[in-house]
Amino acid sequence: KEYRRQRQMCIRDRIDVLNDRDVQTIIISPAKMEELKKSDMADRLLVHNIKLMTAPPLSEWNGQALSRTQLKEIQIEDLLQRNPIEIDIHKVASHLEGKRVMITGAAGSIGSEIMRQVASFNPYKLILVDQAETPLHDIRLELQDRWRDIDAETIIADISNATRMEDIFREFKPQYIFHAAAYKHVPMMEDNVSESIQVNVFGTRTVADLAVKYGAEKFVMISTDKAVNPTNVMGCSKRICEIYVQSLAKKLQKEGGHTTQFITTRFGNVLGSNGSVIPRFRDQIQRGGPVTVTHPEIIRYFMTIPEAVSYTHLRAHETLSDL
C-alpha cells in the first residue's frame, strides 16, 4: 500500500511539473510502451490534454535525425492491457492468391482492414464496393501507395440496388466475397428502421443471391453479437441476414450442383472500428469527463481490428472437420 501511495504521488508530481512547464506532447520510446500500459500515467496525461507519441527505435532514424513523419500518436487502443492475439493467417494465403476478391463496405474500418490483409496475399483482382465516396477515395490512394501492382476496382454502389450490383457481378465475377457493408449504429437504426431493413437485409439478400448466380466460391458475412437474441432494430436486421444466409446455404446443399459456401462471423466490440465506444470515451476524456458507461458494473471486452479480420480469414478457410 505504501509503495502504491508513493507511486501515485510520483505520477501526480510529474504531471504538476508538466503542467507548470506547459508541456503539450510527450514522446516515448517503444521500449517504454509496456511500462506505460501497466501504469495509469497515460490516463492521467490524456485527462490533462497532453498528447502521447511514440518514436521508432534508434536504428530506424535517418542518420541521427528523427523525422516528424516517424512519430505516431498513441491512441487509447494502443494501451490495451494484453498482448495482441497472434493468428497465423499465412496458411490461408493460398486460398486467396490469384483470386478475384470482392469486399463490400470496403471503405469502413473492418472492410478496409480486410482489403489490407487480402492485398498482402497477392489476389488477382480486388473489387472494392462502398457508397461512401470520400473514404473509398482514401482507400484507392492507399492502394496506389502500398500495392501498386494489384489490379483493383473501387466502385461506388449501394448494395441494395440489385440492378447496379448485378452489373458489377456480371463484369467482374468475384470468386470470394467479404460482405462487410451494413448500417450498425444501434440508436440511429432505431430511428431509421426502413433504411436498416433496406440495406442490411435486402442488401445482404441481393449480394448473397448474386454470389450464387455468378458461381462465387465463398461468401463471408460479417455479423455482430447483437444478433444474438436481438433487442434492437440493428441486431434484428443482422439476425435476419444470418437466417437468410443459413437458409440459402441449406437450400443449395439440398439441391446440389452449387459450389458457393457461406460463412458468418460475429464481432463484439472492435477497438478503433467505426461506431466503437472508444472514440466516444476519448472525446469524453479530452473534454475533461465524465466517461459514461451503460451500467456501473459493466465490463467490456475488446478485440483489435486486425485480430477481428484475421479471425475472419481463419474461420473462412477452415473445413467443416476443423470447426
PLM feature segments, named:
Residues K1-R7, I11, H313-L323:
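Single conserved hydrophobic/aromatic residue that forms the stacking wall/gate
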Residues I11, I28, I103-T104:
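Hydrophobic Val/Ile/Leu positions in short beta-strands of Rossmann-like dinucleotide-binding domains
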Residues K37-M53, K125-A132, R170-E171, Y176, ...:
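NAD(P)-cofactor binding segment of oxidoreductase domains
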Residues K38-R100, V212:
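Flexible, Lys/Arg-rich cytosolic regulatory linkers and terminal tails that connect or flank
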Residues Q64, H179, Y183-I243, S247:
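Conserved Rossmann-fold NAD(P)-dependent oxidoreductase catalytic core, especially the SDR/UDP-sugar
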Residues Q70, Q81-K173:
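N-terminal Rossmann/SDR dinucleotide-binding element
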Residues D209-V212, V233-R315:
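NAD(P)-dependent short-chain dehydrogenase/reductase
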